[in-house]
Amino acid sequence: MALKLGVIGTGAIGQDHIRRCSKTLVGSQVVAVTDINLEQAAKVVRDLDLGAEVYADGHALIAAPDVEAVLVCSWGPSHEEYVLAAIAAGKPVFCEKPLAVTAEGCRHIVEAEIASGRRLVQVGFMRPYDQGYRALKAAIDSGQIGEPLMLHCAHRNPSVGENYKTDMAITDTLIHELNVLRWLLDDDYVSVQVVFPRKTSKALAHLKDPQIVMLETVKGTRIDVEVFVNCQYGYDIQCEVVGETGIARLPEPSQVQLRSEAKLSNAILMDWKDRFIAAYDVELQDFIDGVKGGTLYGPSAWDGYAAAVAADACVLAQNTGAVVPITLAMRPVFYS
């Protein structure tokens, strides 16, 4: 029987998730939607021929008796409110990042979920579902390269809009690395420093770009992440793990290699959706299957909280230039 989903937020990512849940994935049916713009929500229902009901707000949708699980895809500052409401209603909830806009908000969600007695929350970090990252983790976990000593990473975008600010290099961009690198290493961060190289002429006046974020983990692994959001040439994600006896590298997306006009070339993707579209599909299918099977396995509320704590420290490091400690409480047994 199909899992009946209610979707809060019908912007770009909400529409993508509605489309994949209703047209691509198996075992789910979108029966309810809402958005701050109700006309847009109604248009999405018509355009995708959903037959879903449009609710006045997220709380009404969560309370609807035919909604069995909730997808929160709305404006970031509304996430905490709706996730807490879903937990209170005893309904599983998939929340796009951020889980909440503050670490304190994430902690409230963690506490509410623990009090509920079962895992109800999955956070929309999709990189652990990417085939390349999974292959990289398998190589690390196999012991083929010994213990990881250093990671060299890069997160590059061709360009960003004028509303993109310097701290968004952490909260919107690096946040993916903050999650996936913890997962890759099965380790937590203890400190961070951010330095600013020579600024690119392609960045707007208010934006410092590129940035280099240097992290240290509990086990002593050192990580450097280049965040360069005006690189011009493409959307490029890199991750190299230097171990005691070898090096493992994130594979490039599969692209046709072209020999033509005295050149050997591979295309570079220009958009994050193209790079990770398959991971989004696997991620949401895992949520659907987990809810139906009674156990969620994807990124947890604790993972969302850990990323938020690290992000807060990174922003402080941006502003001070100092090495900033990252203090994370011990992981509750509930999330072991």
Swiss-Prot record:
Listed InterPro entries: Gfo-Idh-MocA_inositol_DH, Gfo/Idh/MocA-like_OxRdtase_C, Gfo/Idh/MocA-like_OxRdtase_N, MI/DCI_dehydrogenase, NAD(P)-bd_dom_sf
EC number: 1.1.1.18
Similarity field: Belongs to the Gfo/Idh/MocA family.
Record carries keyword Iron: no
Species per Swiss-Prot/TrEMBL record: Pseudomonas syringae pv. syringae (strain B728a)
Name this polypeptide is given: Inositol 2-dehydrogenase
Domain of life (superkingdom): Bacteria
Keywords: NAD, Oxidoreductase
